[in-house]
């Protein structure tokens, strides 16, 4: 219908992966039955499931002769490849039998242990006057123990010796044919053996194809536990092979297969968020498949209660940013709900979109299992936004907008306040929710900035005081140094004066002696 994404998603899937989506459209009656039957016949004709394709052709009156011929051809090729890969099939079967045998042995050991525990019973009865001990009659139970002959498993080294490039290619083609005819479990087992036998530095394209086959086999076999583990090796292989354009296409294919894995395995939905928010995969979404934003938004909202508030807010901000960037390319009620609530703060439009979201989720193959969870968490998001903006909230208005039963509204509101950790109380007299003073984000920024400013001033004052102290100490030192210099200069001057005085005295004494001598000499006649 208007918001149905089956056509867009099927363009990234092969025929086998399309079948569950077409069956769901048939169950939900979103399209006319004859259109669904024609689409089913066209898809089945692309697979090797010839019997189903023949039935689909007959239901719409098409000629089945081409499918009959195709069936005969596939049977002949299957028998030929089966014979060439017989020793690989024997190895796989022996491994499976060994596992079943080990399981039987464990069950036998558990039963024997239970019988031993039940045999250990010795009840006693006590009377007030006489004490009598009654021993329960012993019953002998005959336990039949079946001797299990251990199964001989073909050694892997022996299997490796028989492998040639031709046989390795036969294993690959046999695995692919098993997948085509719908034997997904056997196909996975043979593909796994192919990967073990194939050298890592050779057959890179076939190894990548085998990894895709293993993932799709687990998905179609509903083996979700192993399918989760299949994604990581594929990511590594995609990152290390191909051109950037090829890697972009491969990542888009992986994203669409991941929808099967993560939405049908609720415990790992957070892993889908981590995958889709990686830069490489977010780029693939924006470039090739913006419709995946629907599933990213649902996964984030559904996982709200499982994440810390700061982590959820960071992820939500990333979602809002990419939804706004791609709004001109892709829109649906889910992305418009995100935009109306977290960007425009238009509660009326958000509520209108939320009503449409419920219909879209119920008709979506991947999202129909999480309708209630999404709607509940979306209401909590609306309530949180109300609380962040308004100081008082009318309860009747809240119940009307969020479609909450008035009788159970008080319980819902109390639980929502507790989970969101808001400071609020219910005013029963006025039928309102009173919010205590909430610090807006800009106020918190101002308060933190003010504290940093005050701290900066304190640091500047401290630095100036330190410098002043250093200057004062430096001034005192300089004064002391000048005083010492003066004293030294005075001492030097004093010593110089004393030296000059001594020299003058000596000269005067010498002059006096000379004069006296000259005067005393007699004059000759």
UniProtKB/Swiss-Prot annotation:
Location comes to: Cytoplasm
List where Basic and acidic residues composition bias occurs.
Answer: 102-120
Q: Which Gene Ontology terms cover its molecular function?
A: translation initiation factor activity
Q: Which UniProt keywords apply?
A: Cytoplasm, Initiation factor, Protein biosynthesis
PROSITE patterns recorded: PCI
- Composition bias (Low complexity) maps to 121-143, 482-525
Listed InterPro entries: eIF3e, eIF3e_N, PCI_dom, WH_DNA-bd_sf
Q: Name one Pfam family in it.
A: PCI
The reply on keyword tRNA processing is no
Its cellular-component GO annotations read: eukaryotic 43S preinitiation complex; eukaryotic 48S preinitiation complex; eukaryotic translation initiation factor 3 complex; eukaryotic translation initiation factor 3 complex, eIF3e; nucleus
Which SUPFAM superfamilies is this protein grouped with? Winged helix' DNA-binding domain
Please name the GO terms of the biological process aspect recorded for this protein, alphabetically. formation of cytoplasmic translation initiation complex; translational initiation
Domain (PCI): residue spans on this chain: 261-440
Q: Where is this region: Disordered?
A: 102-143, 463-525
Tagged with keyword Cytoplasm: yes
What is the protein's quaternary organization?
Component of the eukaryotic translation initiation factor 3 (eIF-3) complex.
What biological function has been recorded for the protein in this entry?
Component of the eukaryotic translation initiation factor 3 (eIF-3) complex, which is involved in protein synthesis of a specialized repertoire of mRNAs and, together with other initiation factors, stimulates binding of mRNA and methionyl-tRNAi to the 40S ribosome. The eIF-3 complex specifically targets and initiates translation of a subset of mRNAs involved in cell proliferation.
What HAMAP family does the record point to? eIF3e
Q: Which family does it belong to?
A: Belongs to the eIF-3 subunit E family.
Name this protein carries in UniProt: Eukaryotic translation initiation factor 3 subunit E
* Chain's gene name: eif3E
């Amino acid at each position: 219908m208007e918001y149905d994404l089956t056509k867009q998603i099927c363009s990234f899937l092969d025929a086998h992966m399309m079948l569950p989506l077409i069956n769901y459209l048939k169950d939900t009656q979103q399209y006319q039955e004859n259109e669904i039957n024609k689409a089913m016949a066209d898809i089945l004709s692309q697979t090797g499931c010839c019997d189903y394709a023949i039935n689909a052709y007959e239901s719409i009156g098409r000629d089945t002769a081409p499918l009959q011929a195709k069936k005969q051809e596939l049977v002949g090729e299957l028998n030929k490849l089966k014979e060439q890969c017989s020793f690989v099939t024997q190895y796989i079967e022996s491994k499976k039998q060994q596992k079943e045998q080990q399981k039987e042995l464990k069950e036998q050991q558990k039963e024997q242990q239970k019988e031993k525990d039940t045999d250990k019973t010795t009840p006693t009865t006590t009377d007030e006057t006489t004490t009598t001990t009654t021993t329960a009659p012993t019953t002998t139970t005959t336990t039949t123990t079946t001797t299990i002959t251990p199964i001989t498993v073909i050694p892997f080294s022996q299997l490796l010796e028989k492998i040639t490039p031709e046989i390795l290619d036969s294993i690959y083609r046999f695995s692919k044919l098993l997948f085509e005819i719908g034997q997904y479990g056997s196909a996975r087992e043979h593909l796994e053996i192919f990967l073990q036998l194939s050298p890592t530095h050779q057959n890179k394209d076939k190894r990548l194809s085998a990894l895709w086959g293993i993932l799709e086999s687990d998905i179609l076999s509903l083996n979700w536990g192993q399918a989760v583990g299949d994604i990581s090796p594929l990511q590594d292989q995609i990152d290390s092979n191909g051109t950037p354009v090829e890697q972009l296409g491969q990542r888009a294919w992986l994203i669409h297969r991941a929808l099967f894995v993560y939405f049908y395995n609720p415990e790992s939905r957070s892993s889908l968020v981590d995958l889709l928010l990686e830069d490489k995969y977010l780029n693939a979404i924006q470039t090739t498949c913006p419709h995946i934003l629907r599933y990213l938004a649902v996964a984030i909202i559904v996982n709200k209660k499982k994440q810390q508030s700061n982590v959820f807010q960071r992820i939500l901000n990333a979602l809002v940013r990419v939804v706004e960037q791609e709004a001109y390319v892709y829109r649906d009620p889910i992305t418009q709900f995100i935009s109306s609530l977290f960007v425009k703060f238009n509660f009326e439009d958000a509520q209108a979109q939320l009503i449409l979201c419920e219909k879209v989720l119920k008709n979506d193959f991947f999202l129909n299992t999480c309708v209630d969870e999404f709607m509940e968490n979306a209401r909590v998001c609306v309530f949180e936004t109300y609380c962040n903006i308004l100081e008082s909230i009318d309860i009747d208005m809240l119940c009307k907008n969020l479609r909450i039963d008035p009788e159970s509204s008080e319980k819902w509101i109390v639980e929502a306040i507790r989970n969101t950790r808001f400071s609020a109380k219910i005013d029963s007299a006025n039928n309102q929710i009173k919010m205590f003073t909430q610090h807006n984000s800009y106020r918190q920024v101002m308060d933190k900035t003010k504290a940093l400013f005050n701290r900066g001033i304190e640091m500047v004052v401290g630095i100036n005081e330190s410098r002043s102290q250093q200057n004062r100490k430096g001034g005192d030192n300089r004064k002391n140094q000048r005083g010492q210099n003066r004293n030294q200069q005075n001492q030097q001057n004093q010593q110089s004066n004393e030296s000059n005085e001594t020299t003058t005295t000596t000269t005067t004494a010498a002059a006096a002696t000379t004069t006296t001598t000259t005067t005393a000499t007699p004059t000759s006649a």
